[in-house]
Amino acid sequence: MTSIFHFAIIFMLILQIRIQLSEESEFLVDRSKNGLIHVPKDLSQKTTILNISQNYISELWTSDILSLSKLRILIISHNRIQYLDISVFKFNQELEYLDLSHNKLVKISCHPTVNLKHLDLSFNAFDALPICKEFGNMSQLKFLGLSTTHLEKSSVLPIAHLNISKVLLVLGETYGEKEDPEGLQDFNTESLHIVFPTNKEFHFILDVSVKTVANLELSNIKCVLEDNKCSYFLSILAKLQTNPKLSNLTLNNIETTWNSFIRILQLVWHTTVWYFSISNVKLQGQLDFRDFDYSGTSLKALSIHQVVSDVFGFPQSYIYEIFSNMNIKNFTVSGTRMVHMLCPSKISPFLHLDFSNNLLTDTVFENCGHLTELETLILQMNQLKELSKIAEMTTQMKSLQQLDISQNSVSYDEKKGDCSWTKSLLSLNMSSNILTDTIFRCLPPRIKVLDLHSNKIKSIPKQVVKLEALQELNVAFNSLTDLPGCGSFSSLSVLIIDHNSVSHPSADFFQSCQKMRSIKAGDNPFQCTCELGEFVKNIDQVSSEVLEGWPDSYKCDYPESYRGTLLKDFHMSELSCNITLLIVTIVATMLVLAVTVTSLCSYLDLPWYLRMVCQWTQTRRRARNIPLEELQRNLQFHAFISYSGHDSFWVKNELLPNLEKEGMQICLHERNFVPGKSIVENIITCIEKSYKSIFVLSPNFVQSEWCHYELYFAHHNLFHEGSNSLILILLEPIPQYSIPSSYHKLKSLMARRTYLEWPKEKSKRGLFWANLRAAINIKLTEQAKK
C-alpha cells in the first residue's frame, strides 16, 4: 500500500505538470545513471522535471539550480550528498517535489520553503529527526520521508500542527530499545510507514498507535528466538486496540516462527483493523497454536503474499484448518506454494477467495458444500488440469459469479464426462491454458464474460450450446481463422480476437452482430484479396469507437506486394473482383475491337492489299525457283517509270528523250507490258526486270489508283531485296493534305528518302539529268538487251 500511495502522489504531480505545460522534451530532463559527479550545467531554463538520481553527486550548490526558476520536481536520490543547505532552493519558488532519499545526509540547514508538497529525506544517516522550525510553514506538505537513529517526542513538535497525508520513518541500524516509546505520538498523519532496522531481532518498545493514523505499515520485523516469542512486537500490536481510527494494517518483510505468525493473526483479529495485509514472510519452526479464536473481529479482508517456509515439521492441515474457518469476507493467499485448502467446517461467510500462484490441484474444494456465499474465486497460476472436475467443484457454490482459473494447464476431454457448472456463474477466465475447440461444449449457460485468450483454439464449432447471455468474449492469441459471428451469441457486444490467424474475415460479421460496441481484431495476417474488400467496406460503416486499434493495427500480410499496407488504404477495382462484370467488359471490348477492325479494313481497302500480297507472294515464289544467273540475265531495263497519264507529255517529251539518248533501256507500261498477263503481274515483272523504279510525283500521281499499286509493289521490292532501287522525281509540289490516307507509304517515303525535284529554271536541268542518269546507270548484258 505504501508503494502504491507513493507512486500515486508522484503520478498526480507529474500529470498535473504535463497538463499545464507543453510536452516538449526540454521540460523533462532525465540524467539518472549517467555517472555524474555534479549537477549538469547545460540544463534548459525551461526545465520543469529533473531526475539526476543514481549518480555520484556529493554536493548541491545554489549556482547548480539557480537558473531553473520553473523547476517543480527534483529527484536526486541515490547519490552521495552528506550536507544540505535548503537555502539552495530559495530561487526555485515553484519547487513542489524534492526527493533526497538514499544519500549520506547527516545534517541539513533549514530555510523557509512553503511550496513543497513532497519532501523525502528517508534512508539517510541522520542521528536525530531532520525536522526544524521552518518545516512548520510547509502548509501544503502531503508526503514527508524521514530517517533517524534517535527518536524524541519533542523533535516532532515543529510539524505537529500540519496535516500530512503520508509519513515514512526509517529507523537507523543503531536504533535501540531505550528510545522514547512516545516519539511518534505528535505526528498528525493519516498514513504512517515505519521501517525498522534490518537483520536485527525485534526488541523495540515504540508505540505505533498514533491517534490520527488510519493506515499503518510496518517493515522489517524479525523475531525468531524462542525465548522472545515475539513479545516485543506483539506488545506493539496490542496497543493498536486503543486506536479506533486504524482500519488498514500492512506488515512487510517478516521473519518469524509459525507460532508467532499465528499469534500475530490472532492479536490483529481483535483490533479495529478492517484490512490486514502481510507480504514477504519467512517462517520456521513448529506450529503448536491450534485454538484460534474467531469471535469479535472487525476484520473484513486478510491478504497473505509471498510466504517461504522451512520443511514442515507438523501436519499442514493445521494451517489449512485455521485458514478455511476464518469468519471474514475476503481472504487472499498467494505465492505461498500451498498445495491444498480444506473445505470450511460450516457455512462460510467468504465472498472473495484468491489463492493464486500456489500449487493447488483439481481436488481443491471437492464436494465442498459450505461455500454457498462465495461470489469470487481466483485460482490462477496453480496446478489445475481437468476442466470437468473444476466445473463439478462449482456446482455447490450457489452464489459464485466470478471464477478465474487462468495460467494453469487446464484442458477439456469430452470422454471424461460432461460439464456441470453452477447456474450462478457470470464471469469465467480460462486464459493461458491448453484448451481447444471442444471448450465451447463445456461452458456455463448463463455466462456473460468469457476470457479464453492464449489457448489452442482453431475454430468455434457451429454446433455449440447457444450462449444467449454472453456479452464479452476474449479469444485473442489463439489460431482462429475467422470472426465467430453472433449466431450462437446473440447478446455479444465486446469481442477481442487480435493476434490470431484471421485472413479472410466474414463480410457479414457486422450484420450478424448488431449489438457490437467494441471489437479488437488487429494484428491478424489479413490477406488483401477481393474477399477482404467487402469486409473493409463494412468497416467504413462502423463507428471508429467500435473498432479498437483501427487503422494502425489492421495491416495486409499477403500478397507480398501489399504487406504492411493498412486495410484502410487497400483498394481493388470493382472490375477485378466482379467476375460477371469482367466477362461483360471483355465481351464488349472484343465487339468494339471487331467493329473497329472491320471499319478500318473497309476504310483502308485492306482486301485489295491482301489480294496484292497474295499475287506478290506467288510471283516471288516463282522467282525463287529461277537460278541466280538466270535472274541476272532477266535484268533488261535500267529503269521502270511510273507516272500519271496527265503527266505523259512531260515523260515522253522530256524524261524519255534525255534518258534513251544515252542508251538507257526504259520500261513503260504502254510498250513493254505483255498482253494476256494481268496488270498486276506485268507491274511486278517490269519492276523486277528493272534496275531502278522511277516514280514521277505530282498531284495527278496521287489521284491515280494504278500509280498507287505500282508504288506499293516497288516499296515491297525495296525492302525484300534490301536495295536502293527506288527513285522519286517531284514534278510538281504535292501538299500533304492532298495525299489520300491510302498513300501512307508515299508519305513515309517522302519523309525518309531524298527525291529529285524538277527544276523550273532551264539552267539547272543539266545537273538534274546528270544526277538521274548516274542513279540508273548500269551495264546490262547483251543477252538482256536483246
UniProtKB/Swiss-Prot annotation:
Residues 525-579 form the LRRCT domain. Changing V651A: Severe impairment of activity. Glycans are attached at N51, N137, N163, N330, N429, N578. The chain crosses the membrane at residues 581-601. GO terms for biological process: cellular response to triacyl bacterial lipopeptide; detection of triacyl bacterial lipopeptide; immune response; inflammatory response; innate immune response; macrophage activation; microglial cell activation; positive regulation of interleukin-6 production. PROSITE patterns: LRR (PS51450), TIR (PS50104). Disulfide bonds join C110-C132, C223-C230, C343-C368, C419-C442. One of its GO terms (cellular component) is Toll-like receptor 1-Toll-like receptor 2 protein complex. Residues 313-316 are annotated as: Interaction with bacterial lipopeptide. LRR repeats lie at residues 54-77, 78-101, 102-125, 126-150, 151-175, 176-199, 200-223, 224-250, 251-278, 279-308, 309-337, 338-361, 362-388, 389-414, 415-437, 438-457, 458-478, 479-500, 501-524. It is found in: Cell membrane; Cytoplasmic vesicle, Phagosome membrane; Membrane raft; Golgi apparatus. Changing Y554C: Severe impairment of activity. Residues 1-24 form the signal peptide. Keywords: Cell membrane, Cytoplasmic vesicle, Disulfide bond, Glycoprotein, Golgi apparatus, Immunity, Inflammatory response, Innate immunity, Leucine-rich repeat, Membrane, NAD, Receptor, Repeat, Signal, Transmembrane, Transmembrane helix. Changing H720P: Severe impairment of activity. Gene3D superfamilies: Ribonuclease Inhibitor, Toll/interleukin-1 receptor homology (TIR) domain. Residues 25-580 are extracellular. It is a single-pass type I membrane protein. One of its GO terms (molecular function) is signaling receptor activity. Residues 602-786 are cytoplasmic. Ubiquitous. Highly expressed in spleen, ovary, peripheral blood leukocytes, thymus and small intestine. Belongs to the Toll-like receptor family. Interacts (via extracellular domain) with TLR2. TLR2 seems to exist in heterodimers with either TLR1 or TLR6 before stimulation by the ligand. The heterodimers form bigger oligomers in response to their corresponding ligands as well as further heterotypic associations with other receptors such as CD14 and/or CD36. The activation cluster TLR2:TLR1:CD14 forms in response to triacylated lipopeptides. Binds MYD88 (via TIR domain). Interacts with CNPY3. PANTHER family: TOLL-LIKE RECEPTOR (PTHR24365), TOLL-LIKE RECEPTOR 1 (PTHR24365:SF261). Participates in the innate immune response to microbial agents. Specifically recognizes diacylated and triacylated lipopeptides. Cooperates with TLR2 to mediate the innate immune response to bacterial lipoproteins or lipopeptides. Forms the activation cluster TLR2:TLR1:CD14 in response to triacylated lipopeptides, this cluster triggers signaling from the cell surface and subsequently is targeted to the Golgi in a lipid-raft dependent pathway. Acts via MYD88 and TRAF6, leading to NF-kappa-B activation, cytokine secretion and the inflammatory response. This is Toll-like receptor 1.
